[in-house]
Amino acid sequence: DYFDGSTLYEENGSGDTAVFRFGRAEVQSFLFSNLCFLANEFHIDGVRVIDMASALWYRANENRNCYGGGENLDGASFLRRLSLMAHKKLPGFLLIADGSAEWPRTTEPVKNDGLGFDFRCNQGFADGMLSYLGADEAGKSERYGELSYAQLYQYSEQYVLPLSHTALSERQPTLMGRLGYLPFEERIALLRAFFGFVTAHPGKKLLFAGQEFGMLEPLQLGGELDFSLLDFPSHRELQACSEALNAFYLEHPALYEGDGDTEGFTFLNCHSYEENVVVFLRRATSEDLLVAVNFSGTSYPRFNLG
């Protein structure tokens, strides 16, 4: 045998993503070993597995599994083994699934025919909310359904709400940059309301660095955060708001105990599209919290919450 230049570990695929041959023992050993090395030597707390679709599905009109379907059974089997291995050898280690793969029970235990991941990124929530934020007052009314859409599938998985680098870095505008249609102080006020909504919404929170104090320009690869903005009161106040919301979250079990339970969340008002106001309850065994968020630039001294 000799090396002829052909791929040993991955399939030849289109695009810039190499699809590993997950059924091969040497491939599994290579990937498992890399994960353990990163965890043990660099003390990482978890990994986000991106482009899950490439591992779980064959590309259109290419391979088929032994049953004639498009599912990559070797890929699914590998991900299950990965979760079992990680949770056994690396206590507390987090596996977070990302990508648009339509695969059920990603965060269900392997014994229940799931993939065994801890969380899945709710990219639909992020895309919808960024679209909503970027619209003017009339556009927000048209997109009002984005505020409640995630509830249609919220309890099918354990979700992370990913306002991450994927949507907010380099070529993508920051949260502040998406609000360019508003005067500066109104942008700050809208972000305070948005941060409050995300904090109270079911799902774990992921906010890309710099957004918490209102970065104006996207963070470039190899660049650094523009901490000089904290010399300005409005940016310091936004950072203080983010800090206060994090503390409030930790102090109130209603904001996290019922993330995966339909009893932990109830909409009281998800029909005030003209006012761009949404109202809901978060529940826990020890408390109930009433949450009202006004995304408009209008003050409502009297408002029917129900």
Q: Whereabouts are the PLM-identified features?
A:
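Conserved alpha/beta catalytic core and glycan-binding cleft of carbohydrate-active enzymes
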Residues: H43-D45, W57-L221, L250, Y256-N304
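Alpha-helical packing segments of well-folded alpha/beta enzyme cores
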Residues: V27, L31-L38, F78, L82, ...
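Substrate-binding/active-site clefts of carbohydrate-active enzymes
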Residues: D1-E71
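Catalytic cores of secreted or luminal carbohydrate-active enzymes
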Residues: P233-G258
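A short, structured beta-strand-centered segment in the mid-to-C-terminal lobe
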Residues: F20-R21, A25-Q28, L230-C241
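Active-site beta-strand/loop architecture of penicillin-binding DD-peptidases
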Residues: L225
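A structural detector for beta-sheet-dominated domains
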Residues: S228-L230, G306
